[in-house]
Amino acid sequence: SRMISELDAVVIAVHSLAEAADDYASLLGQPAREEEFRGITSVRFQLANTAVRLVETDERQGLKQLIFACPDTASAQQRLPKVGLEFVEAQSGDRFLSLQPETTRGLNLALTEKDTAGLDYSASESAIEGLDHAVIASGDGDLTSALLSARLQLDMRLDLTNPDWDARLLFFRCGDLIVEVYQPIAKPLSPEQDRFFGLSWRSANIDATNAELRARGFDVSDVRAGRRAGTRVCTVRDRTHGVPTLILGRD
């Protein structure tokens, strides 16, 4: 069985927790739940296939951490050091493993045993239903691929270089969503280190979602054809607190 079952949460660092909580409640169409997370105040939103967690920062806003659901953290704790991944602090009994960024190409990643208590989720037809993909920007797709597929055992589904997009794209399945690695070609990033880029949210009815977000005061682009066949997308241009944000629907 795979070490990682799904993406438990995406963590977004924001300057104002109150303001960001309002914005993400409007964006996601879900209530904000205030709760403690790793000793600090956070706000959580539950979606169909993952959660969004907001935490306050004095540093740059944006996507800060991916937390993977791992059914057996004890065996992961045994296995990961053998493939070169180290932990920030492995508190026994805590069932939350933060990986040392020096061993994960600078990315802030963690594994946790999923606590499914109280994960109620319901949404209107125009609401965002879940995450479609989380995007990592990479200077070296091969090394990032080794991290995600060889070490973390995510299933690689696609490795595509398209000069029209000036990019190499690698897709890794995680539960029912995708961790996408985006490697720019013309202006490459530094090969040593990756960084989190953006989030693409899934909508069952993108025209309704687009209209709803405009009605809630978001600056949203028109719906256009997506890169993947049979998809349509629009860009959310404000109130996402440093996270490049796309909404994706299927025809």
Predicted regions and their residues:
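Vicinal oxygen chelate
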Residues: 1, 77-130, 161-180, 200, ...
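Short, basic, helix/turn surface patches
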Residues: 58-64, 114-116, 184-189, 247-251
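Short, flexible segments with low predicted structural confidence
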Residues: 52, 118-121, 184-185
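DNA polymerase sliding clamps and clamp-related checkpoint/processivity subunits
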Residues: 46-62, 66-70, 88-89, 112-115
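Core segments of cupin and vicinal oxygen chelate
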Residues: 2-5, 9-50, 76-83, 88-95, ...
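N-terminal beta-strand motif that seeds the catalytic metal site of vicinal oxygen chelate
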Residues: 1-18, 61-68, 112-145, 151-152, ...
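A structural feature that tracks compact, well-ordered secondary-structure segments
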Residues: 55-57, 67-71, 79, 147, ...
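Short, low-complexity cationic-aromatic patches
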Residues: 2-4, 11, 16, 43-47, ...
